[in-house]
């Protein structure tokens, strides 16, 4: 556990360097320009500065908040791109499964279904379908041809529903028989799975909005109270004292970390559904 925490801390500092952050994001199939990186940092630091002044924090404490956020900023960015990557993978799987079923119902040939499905796909899954087609068209060995050809797609996405569909398509391809009703059942299952997942994501997005709204409202009320107290000379001295400064720094730090932590937690539940 301790070793895992050390690795997480080292990775956090590793990603502070833009080139390392960019390389990680590129691994998910996206680009993140240095201009966007600087703009995001600037807006974040501006928000921290305004919040600090709003709560009458002294400059050293505001700088401390900025440095703390800088450490977490790359991880927040990476998690956002990772979520986009996982979301795209989910859409790829759903589109692939539905189109394979529709195509195979019209003509029960795997190679034909792959060719038709390919027309509606793009990105990584398109390349994998090409690989599967080539493996079927130019077999090295005839034994278990279709299972071997489709395995490259299964290994990439590791989806139980995909493997179940492939197993059934291979069975029909090799043995024939009635297949329409079973494919209809599989298709209904895929649609229900898709609807459940999208509904879950919608609920999580709503929860994320409520978290942001609650944080903003709490900070606004607390900040307004501080502004009112600052007009009193005696209370103004309290606001400049070390007890208030340290306590406010700690609370703002918690608020600052609460959003990315809750965001990451919700996203992890969405993609893991």
Q: Could you tell me what each predicted segment is?
A:
Residues 147, 154, 226-245:
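Membrane-interfacial helix-loop-helix connectors in multipass membrane proteins
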Residues 56-67, 238-250:
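Hydrophobic alpha-helical transmembrane segments
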Residues 2-20, 100-117, 160-200:
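Hydrophobic alpha-helical segments characteristic of transmembrane helices
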Residues 217, 243-263:
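Alpha-helical transmembrane segments of multi-pass membrane transporters/translocases
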Residues 60-148, 273:
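Juxtamembrane/interface alpha-helical elements of multi-pass membrane proteins
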């Amino acid at each position: 556990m301790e070793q895992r925490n050390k690795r997480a801390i080292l990775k956090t500092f590793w990603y502070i360097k833009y080139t390392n952050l960019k390389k990680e994001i590129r691994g998910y199939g996206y680009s993140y320009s240095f201009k966007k990186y600087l703009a995001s940092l600037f807006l974040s630091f501006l928000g921290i500065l305004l919040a600090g002044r709003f709560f009458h924090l002294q400059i050293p404490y505001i700088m401390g908040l900025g440095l703390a956020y800088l450490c977490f900023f790359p991880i927040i960015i990476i998690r956002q791109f990772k979520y986009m990557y996982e979301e795209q993978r989910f859409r790829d799987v759903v589109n692939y499964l539905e189109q394979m079923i529709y195509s195979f119902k019209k003509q029960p040939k795997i190679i034909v279904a792959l060719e038709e499905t390919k027309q509606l796909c793009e990105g990584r899954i398109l390349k994998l379908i090409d690989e599967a087609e080539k493996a079927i068209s130019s077999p090295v060995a005839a034994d278990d041809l279709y299972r071997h050809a489709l395995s490259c797609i299964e290994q990439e996405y590791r989806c139980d529903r995909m493997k179940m569909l492939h197993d059934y398509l291979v069975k029909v391809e090799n043995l024939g028989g009635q297949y329409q009703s079973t494919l209809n059942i599989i298709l209904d299952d895929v649609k229900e799975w898709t609807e459940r997942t999208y509904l879950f994501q919608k609920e999580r997005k709503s929860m994320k909005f409520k978290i942001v709204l609650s944080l903003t409202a709490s900070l606004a009320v607390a900040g307004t109270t501080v502004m009112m107290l600052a007009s009193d000379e005696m209370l103004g001295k309290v606001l400049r004292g070390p007890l208030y400064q340290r306590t406010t720094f700690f609370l703002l730090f918690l608020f600052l970390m609460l959003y990315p932590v809750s965001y990451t937690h919700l996203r992890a539940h969405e993609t893991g559904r």
